[in-house]
């Protein structure tokens, strides 16, 4: 955006995304490389002394030190409109003068609640939660599940609790978004005698799509990759993904998955689960 317009772009992220951003911030936009200014709006999960989920605690502690280590000037966004106006003017002047990035770290509760005018309104015949329950109910006692971050892991956990089942065969990837499929792959390669299921989401699959190529190339015959595609990041407000605009089955086929199925209703899902060739990557 900056290269084509010379206008300063705004990049919004949760602080868990800083890790993914470090490389381009240091090797591309930094003043010692191309000196491209960005206005970073960073949601502060896991702020010290503020109760949050376990996966956010460490990231919350190091959010400010990371910005300082990268040499990125920052401010904690004020909840006072007058003070915020001063902060914004300072940030604008700083970026225009130095061509360096500036970050606003945003505490929980800084903004009022907002109702989206448009929401993901797909008319699902089968909810994600119901689909998770159906697949989980077909597994035998030796099968292992690696579930992705967000609602999928939460709903799998709740299903186990409701059914009075243990959690010892489930690895809930509560953080590390996009990496569940590779965790499952490694487990599958080291445990050939067991079937390994990856319960993935469209958002996490999109985040690291190169993982599909690695899985297809490694071709473990005990790996079953299930992508629950609802076209939204449900656990962080329901923001839409492009999951409903692309063809996951074709992508999987192109990456070397031997058997690929797509279903959208309970009957079809049950039929496919009964047909799956357990000896091939799916």
Where do the model's predicted regions map?
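Short hydrophobic alpha-helices that are characteristic scaffold elements of the AMP-binding
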Residues: 3-4
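C-terminal binding/interaction regions
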Residues: 49, 63-65, 75
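Glycine-rich beta-alpha junction loops
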Residues: 45-46, 106-112, 149-153, 230-232
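Cofactor- and metal-binding active-site motifs of prokaryotic enzymes
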Residues: 17-34, 51, 56
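Structural signature of the thiamine diphosphate
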Residues: 37, 68-69, 73-119, 249-282
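Glycine/aspartate-rich loop-and-adjacent alpha/beta segment that forms the canonical ThDP
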Residues: 21-24, 28, 48, 100-141, ...
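Active-site diphosphate/adenylate-binding microenvironment
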Residues: 115-177
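Thiamine diphosphate
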Residues: 8, 35-41, 48-59, 158-282
